[in-house]
Each structure stands twice: as structure tokens, then as C-alpha cells.
Amino acid sequence: MNILIAIGGRDYSKPTLDLGMKIANSLEASTTIAYVGKKVSQFSEKDVSVVHQNLDERQLYRPGVRTLEWAYDFLKSKNYIQEETNDFNDHLLVDEENSRMRVLLKGKHSNKIDLILRTGEIIEQLRSEVQTNNHDITVIGGGKNKGMHHDLVQFIDSSVLVVKNYSFKKKYKVLLPVNNSVGSRNAIEIAE
């Protein structure tokens, strides 16, 4: 079972990350936590690589890394990751492909959790992440951009859970709407 948790800003993503990790933990699923940042234009790519080198020398972070650092700290605080070393740093980022970077994690449970930084259009990048890594469930926040959520539900090829108005203190029941589609059969298997 593979779960993708899409996060945005720190303030809005805490409920999404919390619920997504509770679900992933209960299903003992491999989990990818992804942040999608803005893509830099091709004309600026050389300048950006020079700037990234300068940022590394000055120990400053690339855009989006602070959000991943927040997610990393959140995972540690909830004991989803138990690291031998306590520091998150930019040197743990590994370029994997054009618009995807992964944070190397070490320690207990880290083989089942990936922190990913992608750049580009949100829907396109999340769709690519789901297709490339065969995610069964995508967890997204229920923010104010309703059109984007509609598009994500429509175009992402996995089950989608939208987290909106989630309270850490309240217990919830889940309504699982199904029909006779292949996706519904998978959802029923997962729920059982």
C-alpha cells in the first residue's frame, strides 16, 4: 500500500499531515509526503544552480525546503521518524529527476517514509507522482481553492481523501461511497 500526502504551507498542512500519517500508520503503508513549489523558468536555470551553490555555502535553504523541514520535525515530534541524528539539513536533498528531489532519511521507520520536493504545476506534479510511484491513496488538504481540489479528484489516478476542518481532538467515522468500479473494489479491500 502506498500513500501520498500532499502538503502546502505549514499552517494549513498540519491537519492533513496528521490525519494522513494516522491512516498510513494504521495501514502500515509506505508514505510519500510531497510539497510542490513553483518551477523556475528554463532561462534562469543556470542562475538558479549558481544561487543554490551559494545558498549551500552560506547554509541557507532552497525554496520549499523549509516546508519539508517542518514536516520532518512534525514526523519526529509524533515519533513517525526516530533519527539517530537530530539535524535536518540541505545536504540530505538528492535530485532524482527533472522536477523531483528526495530527502534522505535514516533511522527507524524511515524506509517507509519519503519527503519529496517537486517543482511545477501542482496538479501535473501530483499526478506524475501518483503515476510514477503507484500511490493507492492521495491525501490533500481542503483549502480555499475548490477548483484545484475538484481537478485533483478528477485527474489523479488514485483514491483521494480531502481533509477539511479536521480537529485533532475529535474522533471521526469514515463514509466510504462505492460503486461497481475497480477503484471501489480496491477501496473496499483497503477498508477491510
Residue ranges and their predicted role:
Residues 40-45, 95-99, 160-162:
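Short hydrophobic/aromatic-rich motifs at helix boundaries and adjacent loops
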Residues 57, 109-113, 144-150, 175:
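Acidic/glycine-enriched edge-of-secondary-structure segments
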Residues 13, 17-19, 115-170:
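Gly/Ser-rich helix-loop-strand patches that form or flank binding pockets
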Residues 1-66, 70-72, 76, 80-83, ...:
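Small/aliphatic-rich secondary-structure junction motif
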Residues 42, 93, 148, 170-171:
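Short secondary-structure boundary/hinge segments and terminal tails
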Residues 28, 45-49, 55-56, 89-96, ...:
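Short alpha-helical interface elements
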Residues 73-138, 144:
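Structural beta-alpha unit
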